[in-house]
C-alpha cells in the first residue's frame, strides 16, 4: 500500500513533536539518533516545499511573462 503524502502542516507538526521530544533530554541515545535523523529528513522536505512555493509565487507575480525573484524589490 502506498504511503500517504503528508501536507506541509502535517510534516511541520511532526518536526515540532520531534524537537520537543529531543529538547526534554529524556530520550535514550538510540531513540534520539533515530528521531534526529527523521527530523533532518522532515526539515529537508519542508525546505523543498517552501522553495517550490517560492518559485511558484515568483512565476505568479512575474510581469511580462518574466520570472521575478521574490526579493527583487529588496535588490533595487
Swiss-Prot record:
Its main location: cytoplasm. GO terms for molecular function: exodeoxyribonuclease VII activity. It is found in: Cytoplasm. Its EC number is 3.1.11.6. It comes from the Bacteria. It catalyses: Exonucleolytic cleavage in either 5'- to 3'- or 3'- to 5'-direction to yield nucleoside 5'-phosphates. GO terms for cellular component: cytosol; exodeoxyribonuclease VII complex. InterPro entries: Exonuc_VII_S (IPR003761), Exonuc_VII_ssu_sf (IPR037004). Keywords: Cytoplasm, Exonuclease, Hydrolase, Nuclease. GO terms for biological process: DNA catabolic process. Heterooligomer composed of large and small subunits. Belongs to the XseB family. Bidirectionally degrades single-stranded DNA into large acid-insoluble oligonucleotides, which are then degraded further into small acid-soluble oligonucleotides. This is Exodeoxyribonuclease 7 small subunit. It comes from Latilactobacillus sakei subsp. sakei (strain 23K).
Amino acid at each position: 500500500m502506498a504511503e500517504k503524502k503528508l501536507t506541509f502542516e502535517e510534516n511541520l507538526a511532526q518536526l515540532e513533536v520531534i524537537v520537543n521530544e529531543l529538547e526534554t533530554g529524556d530520550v535514550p541515545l538510540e531513540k534520539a539518533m533515530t528521531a534526529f535523523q527523521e527530523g533532518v529528513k522532515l526539515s529537508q522536505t519542508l525546505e523543498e516545499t517552501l522553495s517550490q512555493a517560492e518559485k511558484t509565487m515568483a512565476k505568479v507575480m512575474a510581469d511580462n511573462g518574466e520570472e521575478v525573484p521574490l526579493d527583487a524589490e529588496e535588490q533595487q
